Amino acid sequence: MSLADQVLAVNDDLPIRTDKPVHSGKVRSVYWLTPEDSARLIKEKGYDVPADAPLALMVISDRISAFDCIWQGVDGLNGVPGKGAALNAISSHWFKLFKEKGLADSHILDIPHPFVWIVQKARPVMIEAIARQYITGSMWRAYKDGEREFCGITLPEGLKKDQKLPEILITPSTKGVLTGLDGVPEADDVNVSRADIERHYQGFNFSKPADIDRYEVLLKEGFNVISDALASLDQIFVDTKFEFGYVQDAAGNEKLIYMDEVGTPDSSRIWDGAALRDGQIVEKSKEGFRQWLLNHFPDPDILLNKNRMPERFALAKGNKLPTEVMMDISNTYVGIAEKIIGHPLVRSANPKQEIIEVLRDQYGLID
């Protein structure tokens, strides 16, 4: 079986019973279950949700995105072998640890297959909750160009690239385009301050002002849980993005939860500790791939300048990447996943067929 056969690149065409359009994101696709199937599974599986709660299947792919584009390899290798399973395994590990530490629940109710989560529909907080422990990446580029204020926080003069910050900084941005919020630009992924969020807490989908404190606590405590665990593996947790939302439990109580993914190579920067002590940055996340792209193409501004998106999309579409590059990414993702979970990653020889069989035979979601 070829490498391409082991990759799940298209994940929005599964014959799962649904009465709504499939939502296809950059990496995951979401299938909303029918009310009948949701109610049946809640009863059969004993999920801690209201009897009429809407459920969904979240199916991950092996696609690789960077700079808002999907990148593909030569010879039909349209994803990274092992990437989807690695991301799900890492997130599931951290979500479980958060719950054990008494932080908060996640949206995951069940894991039928390494590529599949059954999730409870959540009302999302419209914030990309970003926490930073080092000045690097986009923050460093802006700082180098003279910016000193980030999300209402003023940084001191004299910081160096990749320097550890005195404390964890929370630098949130908008999740999607928010309209009608005074002082908040109507654009996706723009930085916002704590004052912006307090002033428009309902516009950001918070139930009450006190939940702003709660999300910041969950962000910092979750960051520290992951950072401590990675430190024991001699890995450095540099920065990350969390997402939050609201769900109800079986008794009808609303709770703020972690959602999407946490602490993965897609949503975080992770550095190798031994290399850092030697003065080198060795990425154990997607950042290594981003840097490869910036170094590979003669005009990296195309990848950084949001005013050149048509050129960027054309660049990604017109350049199939070498197999060795795709396999380097695979080794990074699978390697850090196995470090984190402490055992070999469960890999699929034919993920699509496996998913169909388990959802048909064990969950009754495919006719």
UniProtKB/Swiss-Prot annotation:
Swiss-Prot/TrEMBL GO biological process terms: 'de novo' IMP biosynthetic process
Keywords: ATP-binding, Ligase, Nucleotide-binding, Purine biosynthesis
Domain of life: Bacteria
Signal peptide residue numbers: none
Catalysed transformations (reactions): 5-amino-1-(5-phospho-D-ribosyl)imidazole-4-carboxylate + L-aspartate + ATP = (2S)-2-[5-amino-1-(5-phospho-beta-D-ribosyl)imidazole-4-carboxamido]succinate + ADP + phosphate + 2 H(+)
GO cellular component: cytoplasm
GO molecular function, one term: ATP binding
Enzyme class, spelled out: ligase
Entry's EC annotation: 6.3.2.6
Pathway per the UniProt entry: Purine metabolism; IMP biosynthesis via de novo pathway; 5-amino-1-(5-phospho-D-ribosyl)imidazole-4-carboxamide from 5-amino-1-(5-phospho-D-ribosyl)imidazole-4-carboxylate: step 1/2
InterPro entries: SAICAR_synt/ADE2_N, SAICAR_synthase_Vibrio-typ
Family to which this protein belongs: Belongs to the SAICAR synthetase family.
Name assigned to this protein: Phosphoribosylaminoimidazole-succinocarboxamide synthase
Natural source organism: Aeromonas salmonicida (strain A449)
Gene responsible for this protein: purC
